[in-house]
Amino acid sequence: MAAYVSDELKAAALVEDDIEPEEQVADGEPSAKYMCPEKELSKACPSYQNSPAAEFSSHEMDSESHISETSDRMADFESSSIKNEEETKEVQVPLEDTTVSDSLEQMKAVYNNFLSNSYWSNLNLNLHQPSSENNGGGSSSSSSSSSSSCGSGSFDWHQSAMAKTLQQVSQNRMLPEPSLFSTVQLYRQSSKLYGSIFTGASKFRCKDCSAAYDTLVELTVHMNETGHYRDDNHETDNNNPKRWSKPRKRSLLEMEGKEDAQKVLKCMYCGHSFESLQDLSVHMIKTKHYQKVPLKEPVTPVAAKIIPAARKKPSLELELPSSPDSTGGTPKATLSDASDALQKNSNPYITPNNRYGHQNGASYAWHFEARKSQILKCMECGSSHDTLQELTAHMMVTGHFIKVTNSAMKKGKPIMETPVTPTITTLLDEKVQSVPLAATTFTSPSNTPASVSPKLTVEIKKEVDKEKAVLDEKPKEKEKASEEEEKYDISSKYHYLTENDLEESPKGGLDILKSLENTVTSAINKAQNGTPSWGGYPSIHAAYQLPNMMKLSLGSSGKSTPLKPMFGNSEIVSPTKTQTLVSPPSSQTSPMPKTNFHAMEELVKKVTEKVAKVEEKMKEPDSKLSPPKRATPSPCSSEQSEPIKMEASSGSGFKSQENSPSPPRDVCKEASPSAEPVENGKELVKPLSGGSLSGSTAIITDHPPEQPFVNPLSALQSVMNIHLGKAAKPSLPALDPMSMLFKMSNSLAEKAAVATPPPLQAKKAEHLDRYFYHVNNDQPIDLTKGKSDKGCSLGSGLLSPTSTSPATSSSTVTTAKTSAVVSFMSNSPLRENALSDISDMLKNLTESHTSKSSTPSSISEKSDIDGATLEEAEESTPAQKRKGRQSNWNPQHLLILQAQFAASLRQTSEGKYIMSDLSPQERMHISRFTGLSMTTISHWLANVKYQLRRTGGTKFLKNLDTGHPVFFCNDCASQIRTPSTYISHLESHLGFRLRDLSKLSTEQINNQIAQTKSPSEKMVTSSPEEDLGTTYQCKLCNRTFASKHAVKLHLSKTHGKSPEDHLLFVSELEKQ
């Protein structure tokens, strides 16, 4: 290695002794490597030993010990090369006196970095000299031609490697290289093979003389000088792996398979593959191909990849804002500039690989890296990125992900379409505000609100100051636009639509509600015409669960408003958009954007009179509720965007709340009912009245109850509410009143069973409150938000009555259920139709105690209630603890379902029966009558179909696939051959005809059932095993049967009792 000490370095030792120690110390890399035990060498460079820099750190001591191990082997060629250099030195020094200091600094920097330790430890060298300077001025005559002088222009691989290193050193000063390869996916190679490639710690050994070297460069130099290699790299190499034998350790081909090795050990210029690193090095030496591999400025450093996520977070937050538009989009935005990006795009090899250069054998990672740059590429602007995180950050910061969502939409991801060019104003604000959000969004995938909240509150404070400072419309518009942008950034993590999205007009030509509606319609059609392939099939019909509710809840989608896209609508900032959270009517009150605040004040005045009366009534539940509410600190809202938007619209009032988590919650509660003229009060009352109440009434009253039965959007709404709402129940933090209402009405009795009125009122008050603090974007979106213009006719006049309703209803209505629904409706003048529908629904619900639970898991609890009330009044005995496979089914419900299923069978021309799905209406009727949720019915049907397809039979139907089906009656065990006979047989058990199911109201059916006492008596005459003297009653469910056989069958099938126990559960009744 002493051979590396070039003439200039020695000259410097003598001529510029004063410079050298400073340099050395500054470099922090003592020139330990230049010292060798040989005396002649010591004499040759005395100043290296005497200089202060010669004190060794433990690390360098270590590396020197490595050197001394092998120095004896190297002595032969070291001494000769030293003599050569000493000869040339005499010639060179006089020529070079003028330039010696320049090249000296360069060479020292290079050598220190390149040779001093295997870790390439962090150098804080301020070297910005271009590599060309180094090539011209620095002669390293370590190659076999010792006569090369500084100006000779002999450009060998060693110079090139140094040039490369010089480049890297200048820009990648901070790189901790040891973990370099953790980011390059060469995981297949065992670290034993080339330990130092991966760790930098062990040795490269020469195959011939076993000399060990710290770097691949040194090994290659050694091979070059001593001739310890065979130049077998011919064209045939690829096809002829059998050459002179290599130790097994050195042969990647043998270890890992030919393909892997060839992919990795490949000359980047000519594409030849090699068996070992040595062969590759030799090839590079001989062909000079290393000079032809493109080597431009290195791109963004590895640091971005290497720093752990914990450290990445702060750096992102600090640095992203400074250059949000940098095409590199990497966290270290300052280091990547546009030229890097251009080079990256123009040349596949200008990729992160350059930062490794030839160090540590990293050259064979180039191929992978080159490909990676093609993969991690922004589809919009084409910039390449080193890691997925960087690409994500780039997309977030520049908003490019929005522009490529078309394809995503086609693949079915629910992403908002947005206009391609955001307006200037929006962009300006994005730069300031949305960037940190993007960072937080992408760095903290955890949904813990805490991680995001501080950032948001800061944002909000910024916004407050801004808005207070400038109240005229322009800045406000900008703010709102940027708020939208922020909102989008946050929610982009989820890719969910929000109500806000629905309110915006379809600039991009995409009407969300329309497309949603089409999707749902096609889904429903699929569900009706056969089992579709998608997994949501069984639950889609939950949509049709509450007919009246459907009629009220959501307008015909035809009328749905066009939606404004997310970005770039700062020109159109109309109240509708301003109060996206707030929802329709609030915006209707203030048609002119600039009169937002005045409109609010007027509205507040109107509302205060009405609400003041109710204030006292509400205060009690409110105060009860506020502590729990406060428990969810407001920053949670950062997890979704509404509060931010809300905050934009409602000016300073709302912001104070955001910034002081607990008290504002209270304020919100007291303020909204009492509408205190505090600004808080103003803002909140408005949204309250607007969004939660008249919004819905506007929609409800707008279309008549005669509307077609199943509106796709209402279907979707209901499904979302049932499933999302249900799922999110644990994390109560946020549902809006609309979706809450849907959810409640869908599982009303279930709640009624467990909840006493106070909790329900509490819950109700909570939604009113939660309306402003949506904490989870995961809550069901309220599709009605999109219909803002439908209720335009409802002016502020409508709002004031409306706004009183929540308070009044919750205080006056005692039943939990009614309060829930009525609170959702409002006392608005136009509400009669809606309310009458709701009252009908409530009547049905309360009288039958039906529970509309949406999950199959609650079927048992549900049908115990259902069965009890629907079948006979006296059936509600403690039959709740049934066991067995069908314990959760009320037998009567099964009969209805089986009959309906049989009715849906269609006979083909060949005489076989095919299954067709029940129409939503039929399911609806069953659901209304039995109280089973649509989901449950759909699951049952899907299960039956699955069994029939798979095995050709199910419990009540066998041999369907043969064309000669046999139907089994659950009650009396009769076997029937045709669907029509089976249906009439089941109808005789039920006591009514299936086609009457839709016409009969629940009361009529209940009465009918009560009159017929036991439907099975009706079919006694037709029962083959009838015993005229007695009927048999099941003690568990009080049903009566015509024969012992039937009751035993019933006990085993329905209650899972074994035949031995039958006598315990059967009582004989005399016929009356």
Swiss-Prot record:
Biased composition (Low complexity): 791-815, 847-860
GO biological process, one term: metanephros development
DNA-binding region: 882-952
Any one GO MF annotation of this record: zinc ion binding
Source superkingdom: Eukaryota
Cellular component terms per the entry's GO annotation: growth cone; nucleus
Polar residues compositional bias, start-end: 571-593, 649-660
Spans annotated as Disordered: 44-71, 130-153, 228-247, 315-336, 469-489, 569-594, 616-690, 784-815, 846-888
Basic and acidic residues composition-biased segments: 57-71, 228-237, 469-481
Keyword set, alphabetical order: Cell projection, Developmental protein, DNA-binding, Homeobox, Metal-binding, Nucleus, Phosphoprotein, Repeat, Repressor, Transcription, Transcription regulation, Zinc, Zinc-finger
Tissue: Expressed in cortical neurons.
Residues that bear Phosphoserine: S672
Physiological role: Transcriptional regulator involved in developmental processes. Functions in association with APBB1, SET and HDAC factors as a transcriptional repressor, that inhibits the expression of CASP4. TSHZ3-mediated transcription repression involves the recruitment of histone deacetylases HDAC1 and HDAC2. Associates with chromatin in a region surrounding the CASP4 transcriptional start site(s). Regulates the development of neurons involved in both respiratory rhythm and airflow control.
Subunit structure, interactors included: Interacts (via N-terminus) with HDAC1 and HDAC2; the interaction is direct. Found in a trimeric complex with APBB1 and HDAC1; the interaction between HDAC1 and APBB1 is mediated by TSHZ3. Interacts (via homeobox domain) with APBB1 (via PID domain 1).
Family: Belongs to the teashirt C2H2-type zinc-finger protein family.
Protein name, as recorded: Teashirt homolog 3
Record organism: Rattus norvegicus
